[in-house]
Design a protein with these regions (language model features):
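Short hydrophobic beta-strand element within catalytic cores of glycosyltransferases
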Residues: 101-103, 119-129
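Short alpha-helical segment that forms part of, or immediately flanks, the ligand-binding pocket
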Residues: 92, 110-116, 137
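C-terminal amphipathic helix plus adjacent low-complexity
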Residues: 165-208
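Donor-nucleotide binding loops and adjacent catalytic segments primarily
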Residues: 12-98
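C-terminal "capping" alpha-helix adjacent to the active site of nucleotide-linked donor transferases
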Residues: 140-143, 149-166
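Acidic donor-binding loop of glycosyltransferase active sites
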Residues: 93-109
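Flexible glycine/serine/alanine-rich "lid" or loop that lines and gates the nucleotide-sugar donor pocket
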Residues: 96-97, 115, 141
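Short beta-strand->alpha-helix junction loop in the catalytic core
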Residues: 1-9, 37
Length: 208
């Protein structure tokens, strides 16, 4: 998966300061919740279930262009600290502030999270797109996160994720993955072009 170079860059601000800027705390596990460019109603369920639980964490919701969803998440009180963002090109900055990712098993979001050493919590069921189901299996096989049948299971899944030994293991496994395609592919293409140019025979006019 080719990712934007910004997902490999060093943080632009220190984590404690970044969290404080969002009104969040440095002493709580932080999840970034992202469901593509238009968000998902599942984000409301995740917010409600975790808020009603006894888990101690905080949430960064990225709702994309779904302003109605963003407004719904901003309205009303919440037991858990949260920050709600709409559309942004700074997903990498929010991921730098997080400890893990919650979302769908799309190749883009999962690859971005893992590039930043974030373990993932994703769902996989009959409604999951066929091309995304393998990603969920891959997450389990590589032990880089938790796969749910539905987000009704989010509370125990988060409990498992934030258990210190599990989080450390998942993060170590995520950090061991190397996806440098954005930097490697241009060089590979250049080599292919060079070989192609060398293999082309000089043009010879066709005799009539």
């Amino acid at each position: 998966m080719i990712l934007h170079p910004r997902f490999y860059e060093a943080p632009v601000e220190e984590r404690v300061a970044g969290l404080a800027r969002l009104g969040l705390r440095a002493d709580l596990p932080t999840a970034v919740v992202l469901f593509g460019g238009y968000g998902s109603q599942a984000m409301l369920e995740i917010a409600e279930r975790l808020d009603d639980s006894k888990r101690e964490l905080q949430l960064i919701f990225i709702c994309g262009r779904n302003e109605k969803l963003a407004s719904a998440l901003r309205v009303g009180g919440s037991r858990l600290p949260r920050f709600v963002e709409g559309f942004t090109k700074d997903v990498n900055r929010y991921m730098h502030l997080a400890d893990f990712f919650i979302g769908k098993p799309g190749p883009g979001s999962v690859s971005e999270a893992l590039a930043m050493k974030l373990p993932v919590i994703v769902s996989c069921n009959a409604w999951t797109l066929p091309q995304e189901r393998y990603n969920a299996t891959w997450v389990l096989e590589n032990e880089v996160g938790v796969v749910l049948r539905s987000f009704s299971e989010i509370v125990p899944a988060v409990g498992r994720m934030i258990e210190p030994a599990n989080l450390a293991r998942f993060r170590a496994n995520a950090g061991g993955l190397k996806n440098r395609a954005v930097f490697e592919i241009p060089g590979m293409l250049e080599q292919i072009l060079e070989k192609s140019e060398k293999s082309v025979e000089p043009y010879a006019a066709v005799k009539t």
